Amino acid sequence: MVAEHPTPPQPHQPPPMDSTAGSGIAAPAAAAVCDLRMEPKIPEPFVWPNGDARPASAAELDMPVVDVGVLRDGDAEGLRRAAAQVAAACATHGFFQVSEHGVDAALARAALDGASDFFRLPLAEKRRARRVPGTVSGYTSAHADRFASKLPWKETLSFGFHDRAAAPVVADYFSSTLGPDFAPMGRVYQKYCEEMKELSLTIMELLELSLGVERGYYREFFADSSSIMRCNYYPPCPEPERTLGTGPHCDPTALTILLQDDVGGLEVLVDGEWRPVSPVPGAMVINIGDTFMALSNGRYKSCLHRAVVNQRRERRSLAFFLCPREDRVVRPPPSAATPQHYPDFTWADLMRFTQRHYRADTRTLDAFTRWLAPPAADAAATAQVEAAS
């Protein structure tokens, strides 16, 4: 992979929650997005420019549904077939779906239903879990700290997960933030995150096979990982053609596991066209993030994707983002590292970069590489400034 040289990113600080930086129009902080669905028109901060707003979608994305049960069964032919499906999809656009994943269907339904129950609460109750800008956990309406001048038509609830703690961190978060009445909901999401973590490690084994790298490298790399769980709610929209549920972006994380309900909305940019991804009953969508793109030495792609909304039906999805431990050094396995296309970095480095210089495009890793190791002239100028200060 030959790295391109993007325009250097401009410094960006996340604006305060429920604000609209640069638009001159305050976001409707007193209302949740779901409270706006009965309005005849969407508020101006939610309108996306014509170049970004929803054009007519192309044909559905040709995405394999991979049977990951073959990893448990030891079916050699099935393993070869699954590895080939994953390799072809990840080298092209980074998306595939998995079936026979072992996640309990009743648990998945309970997790989706829990999202519905939370987002239907009065705004005052939801705001008890209000997310503080710069942190992972909490509730946002329109996710305004990320897409400030073009608000997405959605609400989210996010929380961190790791299985190294003595106490169940997700269950404790719900009880401590929302109160003891939410303890049952917290237990559902604690169990769901535990199953997502196990599924993510299974997928890492499949990625190892598909890349032909050292067995156990990726599974061990993420064994003590941290993760982010996000519940997404997209209310019906009076003008769906003028806004987006989630703007075009690449995930900076390693891997995303997405559970959709039966309402479509996910789209992936392939060959300049937005291609929809229809929900497959019982399957989950997997996509490669920027961190795994670096771990594969650029062989597997982290691609732009987005979510569209509709006028009639609400949509729910659950996204589990697998992240390395903050101090883990991200580098490809030795068999895939010659030549190494990206410098070594830690997840903390990448998070710091995305928070300061957010770029919703496919060149994030190239821009990040320049940020880590600027050209010699820039480095010399920086050194002079630091010496004079």
From Swiss-Prot:
Organism of derivation: Oryza sativa subsp. japonica (Rice)
Gene encoding the protein: GA20OX2
Protein role: Contributes to the promotion of internode elongation in response to submergence via ethylene and gibberellin signalings.
Tissue: Strongly expressed in leaf blades, stems and unopened flowers. Lower expression in leaf sheath, rachis, shoot apex and roots.
Protein name: Gibberellin 20 oxidase 2
Cofactor(s) this protein cannot do without: Fe cation; L-ascorbate
Binding site for Fe cation: H249, D251, H305
InterPro entries, A to Z: DIOX_N, IPNS-like_FE2OG_OXY, IPNS-like_sf, Iron_ascorbate_oxido_reductase, Oxoglu/Fe-dep_dioxygenase_dom
Catalytic activity: gibberellin A12 + 2 2-oxoglutarate + 3 O2 + H(+) = gibberellin A9 + 2 succinate + 3 CO2 + 2 H2O; gibberellin A53 + 2 2-oxoglutarate + 3 O2 + H(+) = gibberellin A20 + 2 succinate + 3 CO2 + 2 H2O
A Pfam family matched in the record: DIOX_N
The entry's keywords: Iron, Metal-binding, Oxidoreductase
UniProt superkingdom: Eukaryota
UniProt-listed GO biological process terms: flower development; gibberellin biosynthetic process; response to flooding; response to light stimulus; unidimensional cell growth
Application in biotechnology: This gene, also known as the 'green revolution gene' has been introduced by conventional breeding procedures into several cultivars. It provides rice cultivars with short, thick culms, raises the harvest index, improves lodging resistance and responsiveness to nitrogen fertilizer, resulting high yields without affecting panicle and grain quality.
Annotated spans, Disordered: 1-23
